[in-house]
């Protein structure tokens, strides 16, 4: 990928590291995982959870959320300055599920944030360990990406629901740092920028004064993050114009929407990381596994091996299908919400079906849901093969971006040729080519139109047997490419914004 040399690798983003070699990166990522695991073990002790209850993904989510809330400084400050009825700004908590008399019971727990911070720091050798917090945020974000299709949010910002494959990381908090920025899709960045520009249009003081200066710096930083995701000179030049605009307004919004559309074909580079729930790391650490000593990577075989040997349970509502619940969580663990279903199915070794055909709602249980009818079951998170996670958008042809798949953003570096109907796609670009960026727009359209079929194929490595830890013998699966295997299309997934 172009200019990859100037960027830090994932794991460096993950650990805020200076330049490190592969071994150091594996060790520091391992250290982060150890910290999450130790924290989880300690929380299970505090909450007196049995082994089974500690492996329940709903309990894991509550515990993760508690520590994220305890460290959310901006929100904590806000809560202290704007006290609201019934909310103690110094406390955090949530539902914990326990098995009592052969039934699942919900218990609401409340802890001092200070106490949670103490337990977290203690598990992380006294550090704040922000990398570990970000890791949990990305896991929650991947779970949201898999569970909800953000049609409404897209429509609100004037984008098209067909762009949902660009929306990775759309629920990540702003404070998720470099590692968070790396996993955000082009559409997510465009949406954040459009929201900002709209505020500026409606509030004339938004760009003014001391606060306005900070706003402006944030705007330019977001523009640069988005620019870094594009792989063609024309797209980047257009981002420079958006960034340098004196007074961002509707023209910039138009340009951003155009760029988002172009990203359906000229794919941006978006990182993919396998972030697992804390209830996977906890038992592994408890069993004596030393992640720091052994080393760990979020983009290689390690998460696959870990899931191969983990037992995770989930509460199941009366009319839900446990196999479908497993697929939802498997996709979240592998950051595969926007991957081609055929590729995912091949790697998983069982058919992965579209969101609309899944008989399952989200993983979290609302506080008003009846617990009497809740069952629990084992989540099947194992895979048949493993593959390297990609960050290129799948175009490795000599520094020049080529066309990608429309309704997916590749997660796995697996070779495939693409069903690619240029006419359908180019239809999205008829119309508005005037304005300051008309020449750039024309250039971007030209690049898309001239993408040759052989450039349209995705040059990936292939998949590997789980025994092939060094990725020595790639298996290149052949797919029936008559149609695209999109997870979200032709269906009615729940909305995140409900």
Curated annotation (Swiss-Prot):
<feature type="short sequence motif" description="Bipartite nuclear localization signal">
    <location>
        <begin position="198"/>
        <end position="216"/>
    </location>
</feature>
<comment type="similarity">
    <text>Belongs to the influenza viruses nucleoprotein family.</text>
</comment>
<dbReference type="Pfam" id="PF00506">
    <property type="entry name" value="Flu_NP"/>
</dbReference>
<dbReference type="GO" id="GO:1990904">
    <property type="term" value="C:ribonucleoprotein complex"/>
</dbReference>
<dbReference type="GO" id="GO:0019013">
    <property type="term" value="C:viral nucleocapsid"/>
</dbReference>
<dbReference type="GO" id="GO:0005198">
    <property type="term" value="F:structural molecule activity"/>
</dbReference>
<feature type="region of interest" description="Disordered">
    <location>
        <begin position="1"/>
        <end position="21"/>
    </location>
</feature>
<dbReference type="GO" id="GO:0003723">
    <property type="term" value="F:RNA binding"/>
</dbReference>
<keyword id="KW-0543">Viral nucleoprotein</keyword>
<keyword id="KW-0687">Ribonucleoprotein</keyword>
<comment type="subunit">
    <text>Homomultimerizes to form the nucleocapsid. May bind host exportin-1/XPO1. Binds to viral genomic RNA. Protein-RNA contacts are mediated by a combination of electrostatic interactions between positively charged residues and the phosphate backbone and planar interactions between aromatic side chains and bases.</text>
</comment>
<dbReference type="InterPro" id="IPR002141">
    <property type="entry name" value="Flu_NP"/>
</dbReference>
<keyword id="KW-1048">Host nucleus</keyword>
<protein>
    <recommendedName>
        <fullName>Nucleoprotein</fullName>
    </recommendedName>
</protein>
<keyword id="KW-1139">Helical capsid protein</keyword>
<keyword id="KW-0694">RNA-binding</keyword>
<dbReference type="GO" id="GO:0075732">
    <property type="term" value="P:viral penetration into host nucleus"/>
</dbReference>
<feature type="compositionally biased region" description="Basic and acidic residues">
    <location>
        <begin position="8"/>
        <end position="21"/>
    </location>
</feature>
<feature type="short sequence motif" description="Unconventional nuclear localization signal">
    <location>
        <begin position="1"/>
        <end position="18"/>
    </location>
</feature>
<comment type="function">
    <text>Encapsidates the negative strand viral RNA, protecting it from nucleases. The encapsidated genomic RNA is termed the ribonucleoprotein (RNP) and serves as template for transcription and replication. The RNP needs to be localized in the host nucleus to start an infectious cycle, but is too large to diffuse through the nuclear pore complex. NP comprises at least 2 nuclear localization signals that are responsible for the active RNP import into the nucleus through cellular importin alpha/beta pathway.</text>
</comment>
<keyword id="KW-0946">Virion</keyword>
<dbReference type="GO" id="GO:0046718">
    <property type="term" value="P:symbiont entry into host cell"/>
</dbReference>
<dbReference type="GO" id="GO:0019029">
    <property type="term" value="C:helical viral capsid"/>
</dbReference>
<keyword id="KW-1163">Viral penetration into host nucleus</keyword>
<dbReference type="GO" id="GO:0043657">
    <property type="term" value="C:host cell"/>
</dbReference>
<keyword id="KW-1160">Virus entry into host cell</keyword>
<dbReference type="GO" id="GO:0042025">
    <property type="term" value="C:host cell nucleus"/>
</dbReference>
<keyword id="KW-0167">Capsid protein</keyword>
<keyword id="KW-0945">Host-virus interaction</keyword>
């Amino acid at each position: 990928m172009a200019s990859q040399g100037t960027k830090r690798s994932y794991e460096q983003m993950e650990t805020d590291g200076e330049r490190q070699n592969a071994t150091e990166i594996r060790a520091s990522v391992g250290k982060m995982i150890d910290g999450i695991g130790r924290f989880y073990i300690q929380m299970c002790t505090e909450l007196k959870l049995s082994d089974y209850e500690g492996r329940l993904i709903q309990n894991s989510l509550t515990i993760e959320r508690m520590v994220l809330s305890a460290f959310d400084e901006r929100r904590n400050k806000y809560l202290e300055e704007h006290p609201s009825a019934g909310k103690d700004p110094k406390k955090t908590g949530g539902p914990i599920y326990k098995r009592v008399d052969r039934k699942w019971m919900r218990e609401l727990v409340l802890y001092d944030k200070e106490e949670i911070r103490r337990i977290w720091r203690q598990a992380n050798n006294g550090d704040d360990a922000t990398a570990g917090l970000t890791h949990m945020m990305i896991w929650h974000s991947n779970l949201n990406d898999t569970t909800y299709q953000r049609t409404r949010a897209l429509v609100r910002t004037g984008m098209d629901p067909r762009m949902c494959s660009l929306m990775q990381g759309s629920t990540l908090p702003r404070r998720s740092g470099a590692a968070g920025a790396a996993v955000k899709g082009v559409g997510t960045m465009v949406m954040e920028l459009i929201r900002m520009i709209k505020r500026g249009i409606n509030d004339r003081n938004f760009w003014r004064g001391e606060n306005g200066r900070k706003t402006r710096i944030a705007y330019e930083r977001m523009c640069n993050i988005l620019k870094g995701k594009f792989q063609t000179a024309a797209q980047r030049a257009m981002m420079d114009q958006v960034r340098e605009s004196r007074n961002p307004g509707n023209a910039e919004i138009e340009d951003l929407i155009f760029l988002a559309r172009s990203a359906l074909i000229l794919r941006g580079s978006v990182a993919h990381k396998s972030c697992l729930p804390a209830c996977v790391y906890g038992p592994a650490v408890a069993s004596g596994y030393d992640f720091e000593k052994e080393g760990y990577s979020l983009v290689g075989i390690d998460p696959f091996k870990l899931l191969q040997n983990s037992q995770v349970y989930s509460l199941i509502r009366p009319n839900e299908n446990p196999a479908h619940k497993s697929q939802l969580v498997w996709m979240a663990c592998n950051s595969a919400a926007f991957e081609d279903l055929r590729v995912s199915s091949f790697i998983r070794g069982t058919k992965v079906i579209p969101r609309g055909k899944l008989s399952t709602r989200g993983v979290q249980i609302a506080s008003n849901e009846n617990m009497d009818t809740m069952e629990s079951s084992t989540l099947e998170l194992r895979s048949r093969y493993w593959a390297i996670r990609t960050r290129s958008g799948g175009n490795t042809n000599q520094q020049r971006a080529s066309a990608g798949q429309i309704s997916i953003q590749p997660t796995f570096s697996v070779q495939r040729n693409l069903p690619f109907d240029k006419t359908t796609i180019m239809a999205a670009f008829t119309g508005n080519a005037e304005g300051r960026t008309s020449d750039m727009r024309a250039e971007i359209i030209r690049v898309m139109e001239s993408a040759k079929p052989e450039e349209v194929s995705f040059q990936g490595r292939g998949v590997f047997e789980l025994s092939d830890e060094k990725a020595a013998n790639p298996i290149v699966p052949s797919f029936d490419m008559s149609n695209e295997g999109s997870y979200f299309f032709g269906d009615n997934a729940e909305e995140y914004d409900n």
